[in-house]
Structures are given as structure tokens and as C-alpha cells.
């Protein structure tokens, strides 16, 4: 997929005009999105001292979604919260402008002894290829199937208690 964008200044806020084309050169996406912030605020040293993060991959069939497992620095037999996105193509942090609510939730929960799984949404990673060719994406394909795969992943992580897996959804999630 090829993506082009142009930042546009409006009276109240800047927006990014984004256009994506599939390999055949056909338009895949046209949308306005928030302009990414110049930089994000990293967690404070005290948070970094209490948590650890590991790259993970949530796999549903051929769809491989990059994600992050956030854990307390020490602990075993941990409960885990799986964060599920709202509508739209969202990253694992559910980034909106300078806000990263899923990242912030992950850090806060991990500081309190709860592991968190968050992952890039299928529509963020695969766009129109998220659904079978020529078909509209279903709710299961957009959210449910990947959340179920995240549960399966959580059950395979040695430090996670498989009886204490929770789902926290935002909006459509």
C-alpha cells in the first residue's frame, strides 16, 4: 500500500489529509486524521522503574498484529487486561493527537500489578485487506476475532494467570 499525506492548517486545528492506494493503484483510503504531535511524553523514570514491556504479536490466521505486553517489573500469576479498540484504524496506544489512552492505561495498570496486552488494530495494519476480497469487513473480523486471539496469546504467557483474563473495550471495542 502506498500512502500520501498533506498537513492542512484550518482555523481551529491542523489536520492531515491522507490518501492510500492499494498495489493496483486504486484508492483504498481517503480521510482526515489528527496531525501527529512533534513528540510524545515518555513515561516518567518512576514508571519505567516499575514496569517492563515486551513486543508481542497477536495472530489470527494470516493476520499478524504487532503489539505490546506491559507487565509489572516483578510478579507472577498476574491478571491481564486486553485492550480492544473503538472504530477506525487505531494503533496499539489508541493514539489521538498527542493522547495515547491505551498506553497510559497500560502503564497505570502495570504499576498496580496488572499485565496489559495491546495491539495495533487489524484495519490499521492491513487496511482494506482486512476483509476477504470483494466483501465488507464484519464486526468479528474488525475486532472480535483478534480479541479472541489475544486471549489465546495471554493464556500462553507463563506469568499470566489464565483464570484472570479481562477485556476492556473502548467505543466499538
Give residue spans per PLM region:
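Exposed beta-strand-loop-beta-strand "reactive/processing" segments of non-cytosolic proteins
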Residues: 1-23
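Short beta-strand edge/turn micro-motifs at domain boundaries
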Residues: 18-40
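Solvent-exposed loop/turn segments at secondary-structure junctions
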Residues: 25, 36-37, 64, 75, ...
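N-terminal cap/lid segment of alpha/beta-hydrolase-fold proteins
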Residues: 32-76
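Alpha/beta-hydrolase fold active-site loops
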Residues: 78-81, 164
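Cap/lid segment of the alpha/beta-hydrolase catalytic domain
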Residues: 84-114, 118-142
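Alpha/beta-hydrolase active-site loop
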Residues: 136-158
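Alpha/beta-hydrolase fold nucleophile elbow
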Residues: 159-171
Amino acid at each position: 500500500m502506498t500512502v500520501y499525506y498533506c498537513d492542512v492548517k484550518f482555523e481551529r486545528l491542523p489536520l492531515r489529509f491522507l490518501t492510500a492506494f492499494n498495489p493496483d493503484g486504486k484508492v483504498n483510503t481517503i480521510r482526515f486524521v489528527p496531525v501527529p504531535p512533534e513528540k510524545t511524553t515518555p513515561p516518567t523514570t518512576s514508571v519505567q522503574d516499575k514496569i517492563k514491556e515486551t513486543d508481542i504479536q497477536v495472530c489470527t490466521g494470516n493476520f499478524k498484529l504487532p503489539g505490546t505486553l506491559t507487565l509489572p517489573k516483578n510478579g507472577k500469576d498476574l491478571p491481564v487486561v486486553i485492550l480492544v479498540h473503538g472504530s477506525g484504524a487505531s494503533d496499539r496506544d489508541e493514539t489521538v493527537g498527542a493522547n495515547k489512552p491505551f498506553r497510559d492505561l497500560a502503564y497505570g495498570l502495570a504499576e498496580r500489578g496488572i499485565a496489559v496486552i495491546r495491539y495495533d488494530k487489524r484495519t490499521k495494519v492491513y487496511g482494506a485487506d482486512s476483509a476477504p476480497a470483494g466483501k465488507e469487513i464484519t464486526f468479528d473480523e474488525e475486532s472480535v476475532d483478534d480479541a479472541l486471539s489475544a486471549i489465546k496469546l495471554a493464556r500462553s504467557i507463563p506469568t499470566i494467570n489464565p483464570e484472570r483474563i479481562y477485556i476492556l473495550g473502548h467505543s466499538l471495542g
